[in-house]
Curated annotation (Swiss-Prot):
It comes from the Eukaryota. Keywords: Disulfide bond, Glycoprotein, Hormone, Secreted, Signal. It holds the Pfam family Hormone_1. Glycans are attached at residue 212. The keyword Chaperone does not apply. Expressed specifically in the spongiotrophoblast and trophoblast giant cells from the junctional zone of the chorioallantoic placenta. The keyword Amino-acid biosynthesis does not apply. This is Prolactin-8A6. The gene is Prl8a6. Belongs to the somatotropin/prolactin family. Residues 1-30 form the signal peptide. It is found in: Secreted. GO terms for cellular component: extracellular region.
Length: 240
């Protein structure tokens, strides 16, 4: 069973072959434990996937809106359009900020070949991917809250993005404990290289960090949503 896992800021296809005895998974999916309730059966695992997917959809919509607003709101539009001009002129510092995302360090290798991976390992990879955004988004909210003349629309979106990402991570951690109770998880969240830029008193550095963050979370939110949908299909057999 070949699944295409491609992240927007990577080039080339990544094919992931899940070989953790899918026939057993499919059989288990049809017999998932549920809690009997009046009017039907409530499946905690399925409901958690539904909740996480809804949060991921919200995360993606907000990230997309924030990315656009930072380009067109007077608060940041001047700096963002200047950065775009510098990318055209091939300024290496700005090109990197507008194309490289620290979260890529948590991705499966982009080799273009079939990779054997167990469901638990797949979940762990996604946990580290989502977790890589905990610190950057937390500090973005702190810095925006302390910055003069920040529009409420930008600050509120940043807060909602941070909250949704944090809740998705919590859902994924819970799902892992139910899917693979014996699995040992070592969370390794990569360092965001623009954190010092974000905390800088230099206005250009601060906005360059926001330029990188807004680009990457916009792209990564699409990836998170895709992976949640694929995992939901593999583990629960629903919405495939």
């Amino acid at each position: 069973m070949a699944l295409l896992l491609s992240q927007p800021h990577f080039s080339g296809p990544l094919l992931l072959l899940v070989v953790s005895n899918l026939l057993l998974w499919e059989k288990a999916a049809s017999n998932l434990p549920c809690v009997a309730e009046e009017g039907g059966c409530w499946n905690p695992l399925l409901e958690t996937f539904n909740s996480a997917t809804q949060k991921a959809e919200t995360l993606h919509n907000l990230a997309d809106q924030l990315y656009v607003e930072l380009y067109y709101n007077q608060f940041s539009s001047g700096q963002f359009w200047d950065f775009s001009s510098q990318i055209i002129r091939q300024d290496k510092t700005v090109v990197r900020a507008g194309s490289y995302c620290h979260s890529s360090l948590t991705n499966p290798p982009n080799t273009g070949v079939h990779i054997n991976i167990e469901i638990a390992s797949y979940l762990k990879t996604l946990i580290n991917f989502v977790g890589s955004w905990i610190s950057p988004l937390f500090h973005l909210v702190i810095e925006l809250s302390a910055t003069k003349d920040v529009p409420e629309t930008i600050l509120s979106k940043a807060k909602e993005i941070e909250e949704n990402n944090r809740q998705i991570l919590s859902d994924l951690r819970w799902i892992l404990t139910k899917v693979s109770p014996a699995a040992e998880m070592t969370e390794e969240f990569p360092h965001w290289e623009y954190l010092s830029f974000l905390k800088s008193s230099d206005k250009n550095n601060k906005f360059l960090a926001m330029f990188n963050l807004s680009y990457c979370i916009d792209h990564d939110s699409k990836y998170i949503l895709l992976q949640l949908r694929l995992l939901k299909c593999l583990i629960t057999g629903k919405d495939c």
